């Protein structure tokens, strides 16, 4: 399983890698790399919306245009309820406000993996 992480923060990469290293391949890109569209296909996408990401919906649109509309996206976003709603409405599967609670973050990742498995087995591509 390939997980594509877009984050400008090394700490987010390290936490995500610690969670997923035994059962997936984590591929880390910076948020600016979304513009280039030169990243590999993946089973799951995680996007870290830090304060530098101005247009909250554009990264999801760009990632899904490259990896596919059915690939689930987990958003790391500590924004207003309106920003979080917008991210979910545009196509994020779920969100988490911080990666500091490692157990909650692990649960979100495991949940999105289960959803992806279920979608592939019973849904449509």
Language-model-detected regions and their locations in the chain:
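CheY-like receiver
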Residues: 115-125
């Amino acid at each position: 399983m390939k997980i594509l992480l877009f984050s400008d923060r090394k700490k987010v990469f390290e936490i995500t890698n610690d969670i997923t290293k035994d059962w997936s391949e984590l591929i880390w890109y910076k948020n600016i790399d979304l513009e280039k569209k030169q990243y590999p296909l993946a089973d799951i996408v995680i996007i870290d919306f830090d304060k530098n990401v101005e247009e909250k919906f554009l990264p999801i649109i760009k990632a899904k245009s490259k990896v596919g509309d059915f690939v689930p996206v987990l958003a790391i976003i500590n924004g207003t309820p309106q920003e979080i709603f917008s991210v979910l409405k545009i196509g994020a599967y779920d969100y988490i406000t911080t990666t500091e609670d490692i157990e909650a973050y692990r649960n979100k990742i495991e949940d999105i993996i289960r959803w992806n498995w279920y979608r592939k087995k019973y849904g449509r591509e």
